[in-house]
C-alpha cells in the first residue's frame, strides 16, 4: 500500500466489490432533506486500507461530480420505498455547492476535510428552521 492511493473509485480498486445481496447505489437518485433529488450516484469510492466504502460520487443536475460521504447518507432499496439515497444534512439543490476535487481519480485529505465540513455545516444551517435556537 505504500505509495498507493488510499481512497479510490471502486472501478480502480481491483479485488474490491460490493457484498452480494447488498444494494448497488450506482444509478440511484440522491434525495435531500427537502425530498428533492439533487443528483444521481455514478460511482462508489472505497478505502483500500480499511476495506470499506467512504464516499458516493454524485453527478448533479448541472453535471458536476461531487462527493457524498457514506456516513451522511442512507442507501434504500426495497419494494416500499424504491431505490434511492437519502441525505438529511443538506437540501437536494445544495449538492451543487459541495466542494469539488482537483483531480477526478483521487481525493486529498484537505479535500476530504472540505467535503465533510460542507455536510457537517448543513446539519446546522441547511434550512431556515435549523438556524434558530431550539429553546
Question: What is each residue range found by the language model?
Answer:
Residues 1-135:
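Peripheral interaction segments used for macromolecular assembly
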